């Protein structure tokens, strides 16, 4: 990871002693460092929840040993650990620490060194004065499966480069199988956090029943923030790359909110990104397969996309039976109110992975062509006829990417000379 050259924005707010310093910082989880400490009790006060780890630094090796013994006797060692340092150089890689607390305002650590180890958005409190490290404009988030709601899988990030070091590693380190369904089903990032839907069942054999979880970690240090159970997901014995293609489109993170279906036939839930707490369940959104969030509005593709798939139904393996409806709906996440709805019935079958949102427009592709809707009202602006295949393999989907100037569409076509237009092109 490249070193970030950042000038900190100082906020001169004094907090009394160090009581409640973690709560006052607004940091809900991560790695907290305290430099200098009068007693173990003040260290224990930093453990405000199970999402926090504390590391104490001091120049006095004898004092470190005393604190370690005290932590062990109180059964706190592990969640709190201690180490010696030279008083100037912090023993951390760049962008690792969420909160640093320094009792002595005359400490020899330079502000540049403090800013080096803080994560973007992290905070240092020196003698009661807080300084926050700003989030640089040259790093980006990956809020949807294909970066954003426009499906343009290109990050606006100039810091990312060829890997030089490993910032952090978490479990599971290996997938359960490379022949069946992938162990990581979806992955997005927002506001300094990474969210993933993954199978945490034992990897000794793919024949064990799956254990799907939604897992949240700090994006810079990998600290586990929270987990949510997903009771029913796609069949884990599906062959690798056999679909369904909509699985990674069921998870979106924007700001401090996570939008997810906690099950194949579950409605869309809106979660607090820092705690995993459910803030709202959008009623009537069962069987949602794709989620997009743009300009404060939630757009959903609802209904079964694999109804015309080859190979028969997977409901016999525990997956829900195919729905007899298919539509795009816009919802106000604050009230849960439906703003508009566009039905796709009969021959107007909405293809998976095609819902795209950009600059006040919603684009889609059905088996008859490509269309554009007004994102505010759902009114159809135009439709371009472009016949395509309805009955296709479960891994097959079109590519639809929106830019400011053009809409890019790529898909297979039916056989021109075939009397059965739903056959796949050779």
Spell out what each predicted region is.
Residues 108-123:
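A short glycine-rich, Lys/Arg-flanked "PGG" loop and its adjoining helix->strand segment in the class I
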Residues 148-149, 154-176, 225-244, 337-348, ...:
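Surface-exposed loop and turn segments in beta-propeller and other repeat-based domains
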Residues 88-99:
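A short acidic, Gly/Pro-enriched loop at the edge of an enzyme's catalytic core
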Residues 219-221, 272-275, 332-335, 374-377:
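Short loop/turn segments that connect beta-strands within beta-propeller blades
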Residues 135-172, 316-318, 323-329:
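Blade/loop signatures of beta-propeller domains
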Residues 27-47, 51-55:
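Conserved class I S-adenosyl-L-methionine
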Residues 179-214, 239-268, 282, 286-329, ...:
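Repeat-blade elements of multi-bladed beta-propeller folds
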Residues 75-87:
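Conserved SAM-binding strand-loop segment of SAM-dependent methyltransferases
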């Amino acid at each position: 990871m490249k070193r970030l050259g950042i000038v900190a924005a100082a906020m001169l707010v004094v907090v009394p002693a160090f009581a409640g310093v973690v709560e006052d910082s607004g940091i809900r989880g991560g790695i907290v460092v305290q430099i200098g400490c009068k007693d173990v009790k003040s260290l224990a006060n930093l453990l405000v929840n199970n999402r926090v780890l504390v590391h104490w630094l001091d120049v006095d090796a004898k004092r470190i040993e005393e604190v370690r013994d005290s932590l062990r006797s109180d059964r706190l060692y592990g969640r709190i650990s201690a180490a010696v340092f030279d008083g100037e150089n912090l023993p951390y890689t760049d962008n690792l620490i969420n909160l640093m607390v320094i009792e002595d305002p005359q400490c020899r650590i330079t502000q540049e060194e403090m800013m080096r180890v803080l994560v973007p958005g992290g905070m240092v409190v020196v003698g009661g004065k807080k300084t926050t490290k700003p989030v640089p404009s040259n790093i980006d988030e990956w809020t949807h499966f294909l970066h954003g709601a426009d499906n343009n899988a290109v990050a606006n990030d100039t810091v990312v480069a060829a890997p030089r070091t490993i910032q952090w590693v978490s479990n599971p380190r290996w997938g359960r199988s490379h022949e069946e369904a992938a162990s990581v089903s979806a992955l997005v990032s927002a506001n300094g956090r990474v969210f993933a839907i993954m199978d945490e069942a034992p990897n000794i054999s793919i024949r064990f029943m799956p254990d799907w979880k939604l897992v949240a970690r700090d994006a810079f240090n990998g600290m586990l923030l929270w987990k949510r159970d997903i009771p029913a997901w796609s069949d884990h014995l599906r062959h690798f790359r056999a679909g369904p293609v909509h699985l990674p489109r069921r998870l979106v993170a924007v700001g401090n909110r996570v939008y997810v279906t906690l099950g194949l036939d579950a409605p869309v839930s809106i979660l607090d990104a820092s705690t995993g707490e459910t803030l709202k369940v959008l009623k009537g959104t069962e069987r949602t397969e794709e989620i997009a969030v743009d300009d404060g509005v939630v757009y959903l593709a609802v209904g079964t996309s694999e109804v015309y798939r080859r190979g028969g139904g997977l409901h016999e393996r525990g997956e829900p039976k195919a729905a007899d409806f298919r539509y795009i709906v816009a919802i106000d996440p604050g009230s849960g109110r439906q703003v508009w709805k566009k039905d796709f019935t009969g021959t107007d079958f909405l293809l998976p992975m095609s819902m795209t949102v950009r600059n006040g427009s919603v684009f889609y592709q059905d088996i008859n062509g490509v269309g554009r809707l007004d994102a505010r009202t759902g009114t159809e602006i135009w439709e371009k006829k472009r016949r395509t295949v309805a009955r296709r393999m479960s891994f097959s989907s079109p590519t639809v990417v929106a830019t400011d100037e053009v809409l890019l569409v790529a898909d297979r076509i039916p056989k021109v000379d075939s009397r059965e237009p739903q056959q796949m092109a050779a």
